[in-house]
C-alpha cells in the first residue's frame, strides 16, 4: 500500500453526511465515518500518528440533498495525502 512505501506522507480523512437529521446527529456521524476509515488503514499497516481525521457533518455537500442519489453522494469520506515537511539540518 502507498503508506508503506511513502513513510513521510500524512493522511487527512474528512467525513461527510447528507442533510437528513440534525447537526447533533450528523456531526458525530461524520467523525465516526472518518475514524472508521482511519481504523481500516491502521489494520493494514498505516501509522496512525500520520493520520488526521475530521468530521464536517452536512456543511459541504457535493450534490443536491433533494434526491436519493444526491444524498447518497453526500454521505462520503474524502482522503487527502500530503508529503510531510522534513526539517533540514
Task: Report the location of each language-model feature.
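Amphipathic, soluble alpha-helical interaction motifs
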Residues: 5-6, 40
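Short, small-residue-biased leader/transition segments that mark boundaries at the very start
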Residues: 1-2
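Short phosphate-binding/catalytic loops that engage adenosine nucleotides
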Residues: 6-9, 46
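Periplasmic OmpA-like peptidoglycan-binding domain that tethers envelope proteins to the cell wall
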Residues: 14-89
